[in-house]
């Protein structure tokens, strides 16, 4: 198992066996994936400095006129979501190569859903996922409640009791396929979720808080 807690704050630390100081190491696979994702630079690579043993992620720019290359720290130039994707992608590759199970908390934080859907589809593709790697993640985004992405038994919900703070885990397939709450294969899961068909949804209304604050300001 590879477990990523708080994927939104994950940082990948790269080390090289015999690094050259100030050299830029561009990993072909990660760089190609980053370009598909949509980086703002010409490439991404890792730089080892004199005072830091760990390689740092840099955005690489190439001047087409004088052929010179400039590297800028990626956290200055790239978006937070782009850096998260670049940090996570090598772990996806490792899982696919070893047939491992990748468990990710907040898998979709700051990353475009289309990129994540592509990764999910790769895990589902038996022609690509030849070692039968598995992906398990949690999310607050209902866009993944999609029959084209997951089987009913692959979609899980967590229902929390506000009084006891106990949580119950159950699958979409637990509802069966018949009756008023039955779930059929090609239904619109997301729409049904928003009308509380499956539970695990909370009605949140901050209006009273704002009304109280603004009312106090008005009276003051």
Feature locations, PLM:
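Phosphate-coordinating catalytic segments in nucleotide- and nucleic-acid-processing enzymes
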Residues: 1-86, 192, 207-210, 217-220
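Surface-exposed alpha-helical segments enriched in charged/polar residues
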Residues: 32, 93, 121-124
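Short, well-ordered loop/turn elements at secondary-structure boundaries
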Residues: 37-40, 97-98, 151
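C-terminal lobe/lid and adjacent interdomain/linker elements of RecA-like ASCE P-loop ATPase modules
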Residues: 61, 118-220
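GG-anchored amphipathic helix commonly corresponding to the ABC/SMC/Rad50 NBD signature/C-loop
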Residues: 74-102, 118
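Walker B catalytic acidic pair
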Residues: 105-107
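Conserved D-loop-proximal element of ABC-family nucleotide-binding domains
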Residues: 112-113
């Amino acid at each position: 198992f590879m477990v990523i807690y708080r994927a939104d704050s994950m940082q990948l630390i790269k080390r090289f066996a015999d690094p050259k100081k100030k050299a830029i190491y561009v990993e072909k696979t990660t760089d190609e994936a980053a370009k598909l994702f949509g980086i703002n630079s010409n490439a991404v690579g890792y730089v080892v400095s004199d005072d830091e043993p760990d390689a740092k992620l840099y955005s690489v720019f190439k001047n087409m006129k004088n052929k010179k290359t400039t590297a800028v720290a990626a956290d200055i130039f790239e978006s937070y979501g782009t850096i998260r994707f670049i940090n996570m992608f090598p772990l996806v590759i490792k899982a696919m190569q070893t047939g491992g199970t990748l468990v990710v908390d907040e898998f979709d934080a700051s990353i475009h859903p289309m990129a994540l859907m592509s990764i999910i589809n790769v895990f589902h593709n038996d022609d690509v996922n030849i070692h039968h790697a598995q992906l398990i993640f949690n999310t607050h985004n209902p866009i993944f409640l999609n029959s084209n992405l997951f089987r009913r038994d692959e979609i899980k919900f967590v229902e929390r009791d506000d009084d006891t703070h106990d949580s119950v885990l159950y699958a979409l397939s637990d509802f069966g396929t018949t009756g008023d709450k039955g779930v059929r294969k090609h239904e619109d899961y997301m729409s049904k979720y928003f009308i509380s068909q499956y539970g695990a949804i909370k009605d949140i209304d901050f209006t009273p808080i704002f009304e109280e604050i603004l009312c106090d300001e008005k009276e003051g």
